[in-house]
Amino acid sequence: MTFLNPAVLFGLLAASIPILIHLFNLRKLKKIEFSTLAFLKELQKNKIRKVKLKQWILLALRVLIILLLVFAFARPTLKGLAIGGTTSAAKTTAVFIIDDTFSMSVIDNQGSLLNQAKAAAKSLLKNFQEGDEAALILVSQSNESEVGLSKSKVDIQKSIDAIEPSYQSGMLHNSMTKAVQILSQSKNLNKEFYILSDFQSGRLADEKILSEFSQVLDERVRVYAINYSGKEVYNLGIDDLKINTQIFEKEKPVNFSVTVTNYSTRSVDNVIVSQFVNNERIAQVSANLGAGESKVLNIEATVKSTGFIDVFAEIEDDEILQDNRRFTSIFVPDNIPIIIFTDEPADSRFVELALTALENRNTFVITKKNLNEVSAYDLKRYEAVLIIGSQNLNASAKLKEYSINGGGLLIAPGSKTDLASYQKLLSEMGLPSPSSLVGKIGGQTNLFLFESTDLNHPVFQDIFTNKEKTKIESPDIFSYFRLNTQGKGQSIITMQDGSSFLGEYRLKNGRIFLLNSAPILTWNNFPIKGIFVPLINKSILYLASKDKNEGNILAGNDFDIDIRGRSVSQLKVIRPDNTEDFISLDQKDGNAVVKYKKSHLTGNYKILTGSKVIDEISVNADPLESKVQYLEKQDIENYLNKINFKGKLFFLNREENISDAVVKARFGSELWKHFLFIALVLAFVEMLVARNAKKGLVEVSK
């Protein structure tokens, strides 16, 4: 038997008081005046025996009453882990693992699941005694900063009060790993885990990273699992928002794909999906979803402004709100700075005319220089660089660095370009080299034609009104460099001999277009064909555009801020809640990538240098957190077995008094009520016996 208040057991000494009183009464002499003969006659031996028996019974009852009362106040239990006879003498180290992921924001008839878990944790704190210590781990933050133990119940309670549903997801196993690290540093004999979670399916552990914890999770460790699932939850979520368009222009449509999933166990009709651009609703679609069904819905929206554009898709409210929006952003360029380097100024004439056509007159800001001046210019100031020629170029390394850092390049031969110089340029850039020059420059006797065109490439989007068009009219090609992509790129327009007329290549973050015939009339009549102007415009817009993460960064995960090629002393990050972070940088880090760690909220993070927005990063919730399927007890037991847990596991019902249930699980069933009841019954019996004994004593005395 274990006593929760063993100090009260010193009260057992009080049981000696009735005995001492009884012994004292035996020594007390009572004078009775009567004659010996009269006494002998009146003496009733049987009555004397009865009186003495009742007195012994009274003595026993009084001793028992005192013993029972002392035991009741000492709070005895039937079972427990006794250390030196009493469990409460040993100090306890406890770790509270509270699931604060947004699946715990579900509301039932007792309030939100998270608020119920917080209330239970604060109730459990009341069981802690002087010298006990505890730590609080949030599932959403289990991969973040270190958590320390505290002996202050007030501090822990404040931390619990501050918990709000998080957009971050997390694995319970990661929290367990951190809790094990904490317990391994504790010298206290009693060690406990409290896991307060809905035990969502798929969020317990990754089977590939399970650890072995038997050295810490030994027989003395107790795990209390409090499960808050049980309600049938109605939830739909947006799992993905994909941008299908890759070239963005003002007043032009942008196509999106929205993936919506019905996580519920019942079908839902007429699910409305709204598309917002800069917080303005611009499109809606609807769909019917069966239980567990996902659908990809296409939405098209016209962009009416330039710069970074905030985009999100939204569905109507359900029982889990945090997965009802999905964010992304696009960049619509305006006044794109480009620079053109040529061997001969006239070689870029048709390209310039195409870029300054009436519709696009204000789109490009063009600088034109000689090819031998490449090394004198800061290419980082330009969104795209056009190289027409190769004869006077001596800065291929600089062009390569520009492309690696994300710049867009278009390279084409010029009127003076020969095979050797073109091969040298492309080889130094790490691109495929041409094998030969085909045809005769200026000759129009042998004509070469396009064989095929990849009309699915972004440069052809919105060019043709006929969506079923599969081929473009080929210009007459008089001369071109025979070049195969060699597996390093993608041929956009292919010649009849299988070589690439126009191809796309990548150097890390940069895009490169190779046009293998000069854009002048002595090489081809391409510049006077109708496809030339839109293709050149789309190509430069495509090269100037930047790859977006498309919202694949999940809340809580770090993301990179690319400042390569920029001289930046300070960055400002405007978070989705409009709070601001400032990041000071050393000038020598101008070519670095800054890792940003405060991505706890979903939405778009704006990156600024001064007042200029240089990037926008979209952060979204993990779709795995939207599931409304939950683990069974057996799943939890199997997990603990896999990590070699040797202690005791208790499943507690959240409907009961959690604090009392833990005391019962920790120390056994308390018997103080039973002891108190028996003491009261014996007190009543003692009263009856005492009255009867008094009566008998009077009769004997007569």
Named regions from a protein language model:
Residues M1-F71, L652-K664, K695-K702:
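Juxtamembrane linker/hinge segments adjacent to transmembrane helices in membrane proteins
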Residues N5, L69, T93-T101, A117, ...:
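DG-centered beta-turn motif at the end of beta-strands
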Residues P6, I163-E164, K178, I182-S186, ...:
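Von Willebrand factor type A / integrin I
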Residues L81-T92, F102-E133, K151:
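…and closely analogous acidic/polar surface helices at protein-protein or active-site interfaces
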Residues M104-I107, S142-N174, D218, Y228-K231, ...:
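Short, charged loop segments at secondary-structure junctions
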Residues A119-K122, K187, S201-A225, E232, ...:
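Acidic, S/T/G-rich, low-cysteine, solvent-exposed domains in lumenal/extracellular/periplasmic regions
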Residues E251-N288, K295-I299, G307-E316, I561-D586, ...:
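Beta-strand-rich binding/interaction modules
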Residues N370, R506-K508, N516-W523, I528-A683, ...:
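Membrane-embedded catalytic interface detector for glycan/lipid assembly enzymes
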